[in-house]
Amino acid sequence: MLTVISPAKTLDYDTPPVTQRHTLPQYLDDSQALILQLRELSPAQISELMHLSDKLAGLNAARFGSWTPDFTPANAKQALLAFKGDVYTGLDAESLGEDDFTYAQDHLRMLSGLYGLLRPLDLMQPYRLEMGTKLANARGKDLYAFWGTRISEWLNQALADQGDDVLLNLASNEYFSAVKKSALKARVIDVDFKDLKNGQYKIISFYAKKARGMMSRFVIQERINDPEQLKRFDVQGYYYSPEQSKPDHLVFLRDHAE
């Protein structure tokens, strides 16, 4: 089973990594093509394209300018440890052990607007490029066109390498839309996390994002390889709802946030 999650806007390059092991992103030719195009944009154009403040636009213009295809621990950090935000708060990668990182490297992937698909230990230089960015390029009108069926093909290969065909989707709609299901040779399992609010179970963004991270961690630590085992997930008060679930769409409820 392979799990996919979204990246995060918030990055941490200040905290020393808890593991020295690292690998290189596998699709850097594509990343470099995007970087070369992004370097042609002024900070004002970046601000308009990405809906960023002038300060953030300037920061990311500088990031694009300093990006290099030569990745080292001095200019990059393992993706799973560099990303912050709600999903990664739930995942809490800093407290994983070396055996956990080994398992995650084979069973977890992060979708990325710039890198396409990242493994946990892949070194990543800092960037901001949301998958939904309407950056016209040589392959089409946006990043979905740029990546085309590539991400699906890479996921197919990762699944084939482990002799499986189950893809656990814990990514946002924006990012999972980059996975072309028509090209995917996998059974996709979708998951919703709902919290009780005003007498109804609803998807509350902050809690749902954190829960995606918690389930990712659960899969890693419990070495889950069968979707049926996902129903055991009970972290921080969530429980499986057979009434609301379908075979390929699991729903977890929580009555009180912890």
Swiss-Prot record:
An example Gene Ontology CC term for this record: cytosol
GO biological process, one term: response to hydroperoxide
Bridged cysteine pairs (disulfide): none
InterPro entries: YaaA
HAMAP family xref list: UPF0246
Family to which the UniProt record says this protein belongs: Belongs to the UPF0246 family.
Name this protein carries in UniProt: UPF0246 protein PSEEN4534
Lineage: Bacteria, Pseudomonadati, Pseudomonadota, Gammaproteobacteria, Pseudomonadales
